[in-house]
């Protein structure tokens, strides 16, 4: 059997009651987190444009466009529009290995297909867990060369919606293997486009469409090259220089949604969260005022210089500016959702501190412990120095995620939808009961 066939057998054959409780909890949290990010992103131009396109295109009313009253579209159109909403706000989740936002296309796909098929809470959550496993393992099989070569993380993320849709549409393992093959030959994306433009969230929509389209074709008998992952000049060889065998290693011993997933509990790019967190921790510990700062030294494995925009002017700049995260954390002794606001992005005190951020020597100890982690040292004008290290950012599944933090995120972002306090609490109540829902519309119906 090929890698695709063996992997599909595992992904399609795993039952809900065989999945660890923590994995199911994290899947539920991903749904809540994705909806919160979507509420914040629905008015961003990229999201608005794609929603308008899909609404104008129309078609069979199978699934809801989130936060839109009485607008239902074909599964693929609704899922694409909803994925763009969430990814546009850059406030969803990440795989700590490669910063792929796997949860957004997964949630958008799972809820849309479930609305069309009548699937309930347990089936949706199982589809998200195994979909995350598909995205994570296939993404890992092409690390790190896919990134060095300029390919975007959607190269792995697309396999999440593929498997989620395959399960919820009721495909056989063989059909799912062909769907994986079709997705492998479809998906593409460039990191350079994503780092500096709204093409980033366009990738999320493409990953969602690629997965659903592959499944809808495979369920009707469309076939693909089943050896596409291990074949010479196939997916893994071409994008990662590997034989793809890592995809099948130790299947079922743990779940990527537990070991490698991280929810965003603050805005912006996940690689920079630890910088904001460590900067805030250090400044708070020593009660550092901005005018006392002489120099801010940042370090992490592999960090040679400050990347991204040094002085951000907008949300896209802010999301990719490690200097901003660091300076904002030092300035305010915390880093939170408020730091995605234009008021904070324009804060002159933060910009003064940005000019004091420099890159120090790379750490030499505990290198394996740095999972998107960082160390920040603040040198003060009186000669004192205070430092803090964050090995793994808050919100990482491996640290455990508290529902209170997810609730806080939803309460902070969902008013932008807009949803009032009563609606938000209703959504949060449904999330806590998600396992018992008999139909996805019991949740999506509360989003208007």
What residues fall within each predicted segment?
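Terminal-appendage/accessory-domain detector
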Residues: 1-99, 195, 199-209, 213-448
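Hydrophobic face of alpha-helices
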Residues: 24, 28, 32, 106, ...
């Amino acid at each position: 059997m090929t890698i695709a066939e063996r992997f599909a057998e595992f992904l399609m054959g795993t039952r809900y009651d065989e999945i660890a409780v923590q994995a199911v909890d994290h899947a539920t949290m991903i749904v809540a987190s994705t909806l919160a990010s979507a509420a914040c992103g629905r008015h961003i131009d990229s999201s608005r444009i794609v929603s308008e396109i899909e609404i104008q295109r129309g078609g069979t009313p199978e699934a809801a466009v989130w936060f839109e009253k009485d607008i239902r579209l074909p599964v693929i159109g609704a899922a694409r529009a909803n994925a763009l909403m969430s990814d546009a706000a850059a406030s969803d989740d990440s795989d700590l290995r490669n910063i792929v936002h796997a949860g957004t296309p997964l949630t958008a796909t799972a809820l849309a297909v479930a609305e069309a098929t009548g699937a309930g809470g347990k089936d949706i959550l199982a589809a998200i867990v195994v979909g995350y496993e598909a995205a994570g393992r296939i993404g890992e099989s092409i690390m790190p060369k896919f990134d060095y070569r300029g390919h975007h993380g959607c190269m792995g993320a697309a396999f999440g919606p593929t498997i989620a849709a395959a399960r919820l549409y009721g495909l056989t393992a063989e059909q799912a293997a062909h769907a994986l093959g079709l997705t492998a030959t479809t998906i593409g994306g460039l990191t350079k486009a994503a780092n500096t433009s709204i093409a980033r969230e366009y990738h999320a929509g493409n990953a969602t469409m690629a997965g659903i389209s592959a499944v809808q074709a495979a369920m009707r008998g469309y076939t693909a090259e089943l050896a596409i992952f291990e074949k010479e000049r196939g997916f893994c060889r071409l994008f990662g220089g590997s034989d793809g065998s890592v995809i099948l290693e130790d299947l079922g011993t743990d779940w990527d949604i537990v070991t490698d997933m991280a929810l965003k509990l603050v805005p912006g790019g996940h690689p920079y969260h630890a910088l904001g967190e460590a900067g805030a921790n250090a400044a708070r510990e020593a009660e550092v005022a901005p005018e006392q700062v002489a120099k801010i030294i940042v370090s992490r494995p592999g960090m040679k210089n400050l990347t991204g925009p040094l002085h951000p002017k907008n949300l896209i700049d802010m999301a990719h500016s490690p200097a901003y995260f660091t300076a904002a954390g030092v300035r305010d002794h915390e880093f939170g959702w408020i730091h995605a606001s234009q008021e904070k992005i324009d804060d002159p005190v933060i910009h003064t501190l940005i000019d004091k951020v420099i890159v120090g020597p790379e750490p030499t100890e505990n290198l394996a412990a740095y999972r998107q982690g960082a160390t920040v040292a603040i040198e003060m004008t009186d000669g004192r120095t205070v430092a803090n290290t964050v090995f793994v950012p808050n919100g990482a599944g491996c640290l455990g995620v508290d529902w209170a933090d997810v609730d806080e995120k939803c309460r902070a972002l969902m008013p932008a939808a807009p949803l009032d306090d009563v609606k938000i609490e209703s959504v949060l109540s449904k999330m806590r009961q998600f396992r018992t829902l008999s139909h996805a519309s019991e949740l999506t119906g509360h989003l208007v």
